[in-house]
Amino acid sequence: MADNSYTDIMEKNHMEIPWHDYARQDGNILIDKAGLIEKASVIGRVGLIMLSCGTGAWRVRTSMNRLSKVLGVTCTVDVGLMSIEFNCFDGTDCISQSLSIANTGVNTSKLYRMEQFVDNFPKEEAHLTGEEIHRRLDEIEHIHAIYSPARLGLAAAIACCAFTFLLGGGPIEMILAFVAAGIGNLIRTKLIKHHFTLFLNIAVSISASCFIYAAFLKIAEMAFNVPSIHEAGYICSMLFIIPGFPFITSGIDLAKLDLRSGLERLAYAIIIVMVATMFAWIMALLLRLQPMDFEDLNLTPVLHLILRLIMSFFGVFGFSIMFNSPAPMAATAALIGSIANSLRLELVDLTGMPAPPAAFAGALTAGLLASFIKQNNGYPRISLTVPSIVIMVPGLYLYRAIYNFGIMALSDAVSWFASAIMIIIALPLGLIFARILTDKTFRYCT
């Protein structure tokens, strides 16, 4: 590699790895006959790309193990949120590597392509050279957002609009949340595209959503005499920030005793929630907004169920698009979510079941449906399950907990926080037990 290229790499805080330098340039030796260093570069890079997609430690390790088995290598892997440490043994030599990614996120489209790569590796890539494999991985690694910031803003608008109805909001709150969430996520995706830091993009996008909701509500008050009671929907306008993937994958990792990955993902999710709710609370104080209860919609049970099915579908579809899922994958997740979330809500309303066990039942249903569908279309299970239950994450409860902490209403704050924690625990539990029931490789500790 030229000196100027190395200079460009070294100017970054997270230096890029010149993967092609580890492959033989003569093109005569296939990867299964190559040296341990070259094999380790392929195994490590596959794990690193999987990690960058937002998937959990179990899936990352499984993918690396499958490649190792084909290449005749023994591999031990320790996975975190942002880094992988692994050792490769071939009976003679040992290679230890520590790899890290510059930023974390969710990209289900890239994850799907990587799972296809791993599935096809014994039949295709195992018969290529290391250089040829790295070229294919270059193509996959360059799969970025398949949607423009405007479309991602629209997806957030649809998701939060549907979310508003599912939380009890009416048409006015839904319209205002649609506008505010759309603009807020548009700003967020623009900031992410320009690589601004996590805290900044959360603070700016959440503040923008709250301000836009309040501004449009004020315009509606002056132009159409809309009562100020509809200010309650401002919470829904910022729910696009909910860290559904790290919340759920942390639970799955903890279930498999991948404590490092599980705790790091949980910490990452908590950071996002704390920063988002703190800035939302500050904006609420500045704009004089209060998280009041929604007005009763007075819908018949049958109509309410039909609307819940429809809104759950669009809510999950929007979130799935935000996770960079192709439209067919997003529609599949939305179908699962519409059934699972409507079941959860109906269990609470019709049977009086507490919210946490109802959330467990909804997540279990989503997991079972996703496992059944995966057998037919091959979509990554996590790309279907997480979007389908992210609308069950109690973002409203978490915000109200922080809001009440801020105004020193400690009794209310603890009540909201306890309710949120119980639901947050129940959601990954539902997916975990669905996985235990349907996946024999997940059922055992090793």
What is the predicted function of each stretch?
Residues 220-229, 287-301, 404-415:
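Membrane-interface helix termini and inter-helical loops of multi-pass transporters
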